UniProtKB/Swiss-Prot annotation:
GO terms for biological process: sorocarp development. The lineage of its organism: Eukaryota, Amoebozoa, Evosea, Eumycetozoa, Dictyostelia. It comes from the Eukaryota. This is HssA/B-like protein 48. It comes from Dictyostelium discoideum (Social amoeba). Belongs to the hssA/B family. Residues 1-20, 78-97 are annotated as: Disordered. PANTHER family: HSSA/B-LIKE PROTEIN 1-RELATED-RELATED, HSSA_B-LIKE PROTEIN 1-RELATED. Pfam families: Coiled (PF05710).
Length: 97
């Protein structure tokens, strides 16, 4: 299992402020998923940046668990928060890869 960090600076139009989100996660290469999909995923416990739909955080595929597409999918993720293009509970692929 490989650890990685994703850093994103997001501007919130409603407050005109920037928030820096740092998320540490672990990606796996189980099944058809690659480690890169972990960084793109925003599944269970993922972070939805200021409600703007940026999916950062965990993209796990452990024992058929949570699999997500992160910012590429706009439905509800494993964590139950609205996706809006951020969190997604997809087929395990990352950004169409």
């Amino acid at each position: 299992m490989t650890l990685f960090a994703s850093i994103s600076s997001i501007s919130n139009p409603s407050t005109s402020s920037k928030s820096s989100i740092v998320s540490f996660g672990s990606g796996t290469s189980m099944g058809s998923n690659s480690i890169a999909c972990g960084g793109c995923g925003g599944g269970s416990g993922g972070i939805l940046g200021s409600g703007l739909g940026f999916g950062l955080g965990l993209g796990l595929n452990l024992s058929g668990g949570f699999r997500s597409r992160g910012a590429c999918r706009g439905n509800n993720g494993g964590s139950g928060y609205p996706g809006n293009g951020g969190m997604g509970g997809g087929n395990g692929s990352c950004c169409g890869i």
